[in-house]
């Protein structure tokens, strides 16, 4: 392993995963010196709130349940939650749901650790470095990995602080639902992109790389299960939780930034753009970092295929293996188009997307971003 001259890594996230993982929450609350959590739930009525409450059984731990976090919560919602937290004597926060619920929980944690105004007055996207309350996250639907990360979006503002990461992520198969059509595939590709781009980044973090390898292997080893969507939920949830840790300790790569820029410039969804762009961006990065690309073949293809591939061919095999994995994860129903052109992205929109992505310091210049987009538009390997 090549060690950089300087790197940093931070993660407070403990993961409890598997059958009856929910029943460990009262124990973890006690370890955090918390006695009454406020549990935030989405507006869906799918039985997850009842399953969650039942897991507390005879633990003697009271919970305050708030059902109905809206799809786009605002500061009025935050003040309502802050008042409920204060009036009911809560001392911890649990997010039960997906990305919106996790973001609301992070915003509330900033507010209850100080005042609601602290969130509105936060500058530079970074909340005050106060010690926040215990925060647990229990996924029920596929997210994008940001749920366990240091990032949050609330009230059309973005926030970033390592203190926003949950203290505990609880992955219990009883709670997991597939969500909207295409959501599971989008979640798995998002986790894969975070991991792959962290492994190919110019300043590679060896600890982030270890987490990234686990994310990739979880997805690769369960690619067959992805065709039976319910069987893929637990591996995907674990991969997403770990990818949030990777995301917090890495810089988003060109595929992620170009996909976001392209979705802002054209009607294509960010998830579809990312699925098309990732192999092309990975091939581009492989030319810059061939040794890292060769190493990346190991988690993508597995030990047997890696050892059978001659050392001099491993870097070149990485991007095709990545493309194959994305197709396997998507399955026939969610398979992405073969190219941006096939996805009806106007070719004339590519320069604007490249400019937008370059402004966000993607590590690829405007010209390099346009090269990646052009290859993805034609579908050239």
Predicted feature locations:
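Carboxylate- and glycine-rich phosphate/diphosphate-binding segment that chelates Mg2+/Mn2+
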Residues: 151-250
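Short alpha-helical scaffolding segments that buttress acidic/His motifs in well-ordered protein cores
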Residues: 192-196, 236-244, 259, 278, ...
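C-terminal charged capping/lid subdomain of soluble metabolic enzymes
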Residues: 300-381
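Flexible, glycine/charged-enriched surface loops at secondary-structure junctions
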Residues: 202-211, 225-235, 250-255, 308-312, ...
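C-terminal catalytic subdomain
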Residues: 250-323
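Glycine/threonine-rich beta-strand-loop-alpha-helix active-site module
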Residues: 76-174
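ATP/NTP phosphate-donor binding region
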Residues: 1-92
């Amino acid at each position: 392993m090549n060690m950089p001259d300087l790197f940093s890594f931070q993660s407070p996230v403990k993961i409890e995963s598997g059958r009856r993982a929910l029943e460990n929450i009262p124990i973890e609350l006690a370890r955090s010196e918390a006695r009454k959590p406020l549990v935030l739930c989405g507006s869906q009525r799918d039985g997850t709130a009842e399953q969650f409450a039942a897991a507390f059984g005879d633990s003697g731990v009271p919970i305050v349940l708030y059902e109905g976090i809206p799809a786009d919560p605002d500061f009025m919602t935050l003040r309502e939650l802050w008042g409920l937290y204060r009036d009911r004597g809560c001392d911890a926060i649990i997010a039960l749901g997906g990305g919106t619920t996790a973001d609301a929980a992070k915003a509330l944690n900033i507010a209850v650790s100080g005042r609601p105004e602290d969130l509105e007055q936060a500058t530079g996207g970074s909340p005050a470095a106060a010690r926040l309350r215990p925060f647990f996250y229990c996924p029920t639907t596929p997210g994008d990995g940001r749920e366990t990360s240091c990032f949050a979006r609330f009230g059309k503002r973005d926030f970033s602080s390592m203190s926003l990461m949950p203290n505990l992520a609880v992955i219990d198969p009883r709670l997991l639902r597939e969500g909207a059509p295409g959501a599971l595939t989008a979640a798995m590709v998002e986790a894969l992109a975070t991991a792959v781009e962290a492994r190919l980044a110019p300043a590679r973090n060896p600890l982030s790389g270890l987490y990234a390898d686990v994310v990739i292997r979880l997805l690769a080893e369960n690619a067959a299960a992805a065709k039976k969507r319910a069987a893929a939920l637990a591996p995907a949830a674990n991969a997403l939780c770990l990818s949030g840790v990777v995301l917090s300790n890495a810089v988003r790569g060109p595929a992620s930034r170009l996909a976001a820029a392209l979705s802002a410039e054209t009607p294509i969804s960010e998830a579809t753009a990312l699925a098309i762009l990732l192999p092309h961006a990975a091939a581009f990065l492989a030319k810059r970092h061939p040794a890292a690309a060769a190493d990346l073949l190991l988690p993508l293809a597995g030990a047997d295929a890696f050892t059978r591939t001659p050392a001099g061919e491993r870097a070149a095999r990485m991007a095709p293996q990545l493309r194959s994995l994305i197709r396997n994860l998507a399955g026939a129903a969610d398979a992405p188009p073969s190219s941006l052109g096939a996805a009806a992205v106007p070719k004339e929109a590519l320069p604007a997307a490249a400019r937008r992505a370059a402004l966000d310091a993607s590590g690829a210049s405007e010209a390099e971003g346009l090269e990646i987009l052009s290859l993805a538009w034609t579908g050239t390997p």
